[in-house]
Amino acid sequence: MSCQQNQQQCQPPPKCPSPKCPPKSPVQCLPPASSGCAPSSGGCGPSSEGGCFLNHHRRHHRCRRQRPNSCDRGSGQQGGGSGCGHGSGGCC
């Protein structure tokens, strides 16, 4: 009797199925961003900055390394003349 009880206790717990636990992906950014930012910028514009903070933060660092002047001034955040527009590279 005790042997059967031990076998029941030693069974591994059921694993979480993949559909219930999907990893975070940029796809979650696209639906809210389609209304406020161009999809070519990765779907992480200023309108969706709250729901897409990680991707926006990562893109911002990458853009600052490439074009520090235009991004730090913020000249391209509204109009986008020097490479930081809504659809240029994720610095909007």
Swiss-Prot record:
GO terms for biological process: keratinization. Residues 1-46, 63-92 are annotated as: Disordered. Signal peptide: none annotated. Skin-specific. Expression was readily detected in adult trunk skin, adult arm skin, fetal skin, penal skin, vulva, esophagus and tongue. Not expressed in the cervix, rectum, lung, colon, or placenta. Residues 1-10, 26-46 have a biased composition (Low complexity). Residues 11-25 have a biased composition (Pro residues). Precursors of the cornified envelope of the stratum corneum. Belongs to the LCE cluster present on 1q21. Interacts with CYSRT1. This is Late cornified envelope protein 3D. It comes from Homo sapiens (Human).
